[in-house]
Amino acid sequence: MAPTAQVAKKGSKKAVKGTKTAXGGKKRNRKRKESYGIYIYKVLKQVHPDTGISSRAMVIMNSFVNDIFERIAGESSRLAQYNKKSTISSREIQTAVRLILPGELAKHAVSEGTKAVTKYTTSK
Protein backbone atom coordinates (compact mmCIF):
# COMPACT_ATOMS: atom_id res chain seq x y z
CA MET A 1 0.00 0.00 0.00
CA ALA A 2 1.17 3.52 -0.78
CA PRO A 3 1.61 5.86 2.19
CA THR A 4 -1.26 8.32 2.49
CA ALA A 5 -0.43 12.00 2.73
CA GLN A 6 -2.33 14.12 5.20
CA VAL A 7 -4.28 16.80 3.38
CA ALA A 8 -5.59 19.83 5.25
CA LYS A 9 -9.33 20.11 4.79
CA LYS A 10 -11.01 23.40 3.97
CA GLY A 11 -11.69 25.35 7.15
CA SER A 12 -9.22 23.37 9.27
CA LYS A 13 -6.59 25.28 11.18
CA LYS A 14 -2.94 24.39 11.59
CA ALA A 15 -0.87 25.34 14.61
CA VAL A 16 1.56 28.04 13.54
CA LYS A 17 5.01 27.57 15.01
CA GLY A 18 6.93 30.70 15.98
CA THR A 19 10.05 31.41 13.95
CA LYS A 20 13.31 31.48 15.85
CA THR A 21 15.64 34.46 15.94
CA ALA A 22 19.45 34.36 15.64
CA UNK A 23 19.73 34.27 19.45
CA GLY A 24 17.49 31.21 19.56
CA GLY A 25 14.48 32.92 21.16
CA LYS A 26 11.04 33.03 19.59
CA LYS A 27 10.11 35.97 17.41
CA ARG A 28 7.06 37.91 18.62
CA ASN A 29 4.33 38.90 16.21
CA ARG A 30 4.09 42.68 16.30
CA LYS A 31 0.63 44.14 16.73
CA ARG A 32 -0.31 46.39 13.82
CA LYS A 33 -1.00 50.04 14.58
CA GLU A 34 -3.91 51.41 12.60
CA SER A 35 -3.64 54.95 11.32
CA TYR A 36 -5.11 57.37 8.79
CA GLY A 37 -1.58 58.12 7.55
CA ILE A 38 -1.95 56.90 3.97
CA TYR A 39 -5.23 58.79 3.52
CA ILE A 40 -3.80 62.00 5.01
CA TYR A 41 -0.85 61.65 2.63
CA LYS A 42 -3.15 61.11 -0.39
CA VAL A 43 -5.17 64.24 0.46
CA LEU A 44 -1.96 66.24 0.97
CA LYS A 45 -0.74 65.20 -2.49
CA GLN A 46 -4.08 66.20 -4.06
CA VAL A 47 -3.93 69.66 -2.47
CA HIS A 48 -0.15 70.31 -2.54
CA PRO A 49 1.66 67.78 -4.80
CA ASP A 50 5.14 69.16 -4.04
CA THR A 51 4.77 69.26 -0.23
CA GLY A 52 5.85 66.53 2.20
CA ILE A 53 4.93 65.81 5.82
CA SER A 54 7.14 64.91 8.78
CA SER A 55 6.39 61.84 10.90
CA ARG A 56 5.64 64.06 13.91
CA ALA A 57 3.15 66.12 11.87
CA MET A 58 1.59 62.86 10.67
CA VAL A 59 1.12 61.71 14.29
CA ILE A 60 -0.55 65.06 15.10
CA MET A 61 -2.83 64.84 12.04
CA ASN A 62 -3.76 61.24 12.89
CA SER A 63 -4.61 62.31 16.44
CA PHE A 64 -6.72 65.17 15.05
CA VAL A 65 -8.67 62.84 12.72
CA ASN A 66 -9.29 60.37 15.58
CA ASP A 67 -10.49 63.20 17.85
CA ILE A 68 -12.91 64.62 15.26
CA PHE A 69 -14.16 61.11 14.43
CA GLU A 70 -14.89 60.40 18.12
CA ARG A 71 -16.68 63.74 18.56
CA ILE A 72 -18.88 63.18 15.50
CA ALA A 73 -19.61 59.56 16.48
CA GLY A 74 -20.52 60.57 20.04
CA GLU A 75 -22.76 63.44 18.96
CA SER A 76 -24.52 61.40 16.26
CA SER A 77 -25.06 58.60 18.80
CA ARG A 78 -26.68 61.09 21.20
CA LEU A 79 -28.89 62.45 18.40
CA ALA A 80 -30.05 58.92 17.51
CA GLN A 81 -30.88 58.26 21.19
CA TYR A 82 -32.86 61.52 21.48
CA ASN A 83 -34.93 60.52 18.46
CA LYS A 84 -35.38 56.95 19.79
CA LYS A 85 -33.55 55.40 16.84
CA SER A 86 -31.19 52.44 17.03
CA THR A 87 -29.33 53.27 13.82
CA ILE A 88 -27.02 56.18 13.05
CA SER A 89 -27.84 57.43 9.54
CA SER A 90 -26.19 60.05 7.34
CA ARG A 91 -28.75 62.54 8.70
CA GLU A 92 -27.45 62.16 12.29
CA ILE A 93 -23.87 62.47 11.10
CA GLN A 94 -24.70 65.59 9.08
CA THR A 95 -26.43 67.20 12.09
CA ALA A 96 -23.51 66.26 14.35
CA VAL A 97 -21.07 67.90 11.92
CA ARG A 98 -23.19 71.07 11.90
CA LEU A 99 -23.17 71.12 15.73
CA ILE A 100 -19.44 70.38 16.17
CA LEU A 101 -17.74 72.34 13.38
CA PRO A 102 -17.97 76.14 13.26
CA GLY A 103 -19.70 78.13 10.48
CA GLU A 104 -18.10 77.90 7.06
CA LEU A 105 -16.14 74.76 7.97
CA ALA A 106 -19.40 72.93 8.73
CA LYS A 107 -20.89 74.02 5.38
CA HIS A 108 -17.88 72.72 3.46
CA ALA A 109 -17.82 69.46 5.45
CA VAL A 110 -21.54 68.86 4.82
CA SER A 111 -21.21 69.53 1.08
CA GLU A 112 -18.15 67.23 0.78
CA GLY A 113 -19.92 64.53 2.82
CA THR A 114 -23.04 64.75 0.66
CA LYS A 115 -20.87 64.53 -2.46
CA ALA A 116 -19.09 61.42 -1.09
CA VAL A 117 -22.37 59.68 -0.16
CA THR A 118 -23.82 60.46 -3.62
CA LYS A 119 -20.69 59.10 -5.32
CA TYR A 120 -20.87 55.93 -3.20
CA THR A 121 -24.58 55.28 -3.86
CA THR A 122 -24.26 55.83 -7.63
CA SER A 123 -21.28 53.45 -7.85
CA LYS A 124 -23.32 50.54 -6.42
Curated annotation (Swiss-Prot):
Region feature Disordered, mapped onto this chain: 1-31
SUPFAM superfamilies found in the cross-reference section: Histone-fold
Superkingdom of source: Eukaryota
Localization per record: Nucleus; Chromosome
Glycosylation sites: S111
Glycyl lysine isopeptide (Lys-Gly) (interchain with G-Cter in ubiquitin) cross-link, renumbered residues: K119
Keywords: Chromosome, DNA-binding, Glycoprotein, Isopeptide bond, Nucleosome core, Nucleus, Ubl conjugation
Family matches, as Gene3D superfamilies: Histone, subunit A (1.10.20.10)
Keyword NADP: no
Quaternary structure and partners: The nucleosome is a histone octamer containing two molecules each of H2A, H2B, H3 and H4 assembled in one H3-H4 heterotetramer and two H2A-H2B heterodimers. The octamer wraps approximately 147 bp of DNA.
Similarity comment: Belongs to the histone H2B family.
PANTHER family linked to this entry: HISTONE H2B
Function statement: Core component of nucleosome. Nucleosomes wrap and compact DNA into chromatin, limiting DNA accessibility to the cellular machineries which require DNA as a template. Histones thereby play a central role in transcription regulation, DNA repair, DNA replication and chromosomal stability. DNA accessibility is regulated via a complex set of post-translational modifications of histones, also called histone code, and nucleosome remodeling.
Name of this chain's protein: Histone H2B, embryonic
Phylogenetic lineage: Eukaryota, Metazoa, Echinodermata, Eleutherozoa, Echinozoa
